[in-house]
Amino acid sequence: NMVACQVAHTIFNTPVKIARIRHQPYLDPIYGDLYSPDQLPIDHIISPEAEVSAAVSNQLRVPGAFDVKDMCGGRMNLVGVQCSEVSPIIDTPIRHLTNLFPDLSMTILAVIRDGKLTLPRDGAEMMKPGDRVYFVCDSEHLDRAMATFAHEEHEARSVLIAGGGAIGQMLATEIETNFQNTKVHLIERNASRAHFLAENLRETRIFNGDALDSSILAEADVGTTETFVAVTDDDEVNILSALLAKRNGAAHAVALVNIPGFIPLVAALGVDAVINPSQITVSSIL
């Protein structure tokens, strides 16, 4: 990918070059000068692992949502949320929301009901319990916007991660660095990798074992976990461990799923949020 950008620049004079780079050492800030017109002419770098880690991090900040995206440099948020039966906006025409909440900067973009997408063009549509709704709002109004859907969950204070690969390590590092007073536990099946993580993660407690083993989940305090995140390299393990974690007491479960056909099934099974690396990478490029 890096060489392809060089060829596009040198031979074809392509104005914008975007490269997917997965090998994490290439992303170290000390090599920032490497990506310049005089060196490797890459304008934008996409790291699938970093993008997935950021997506999960957003889920931890807004646990009531199934999808969260930052926009305009973090000044706005695009959020996907499921309507609760006790939401105050149930059976209210969308165009009336401005009258009900005049100080709330929020726009409903789409409503998904029974797998069918509806764009509320005239504002006459009404939301029903179980609808999956996408809206955009000012970041400072996010908590109030979530409250209108009866979601007032606080930022996760205890997180259990299944999978200690690149994504799991980056997510644990992100939580250690940017989440205050959040307890992090991580389950990794490979013993040598678990030792590596234990040596490199300062505040994360590492458990060597199988995330599908109920005894390991219990040892990792799954019963008191607010958010369980499954980011192994196996879709089946991610889905099943997320369901097992919820059955054993985890309040919220997020699963990494690579196979697109699995995504609608996972939500129906009871997993709260699904992260798809391909969708996230394409979204980042766009």
Predicted regions and their residues:
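Cytosolic regulatory regions of ion transport systems
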Residues: N1-L286
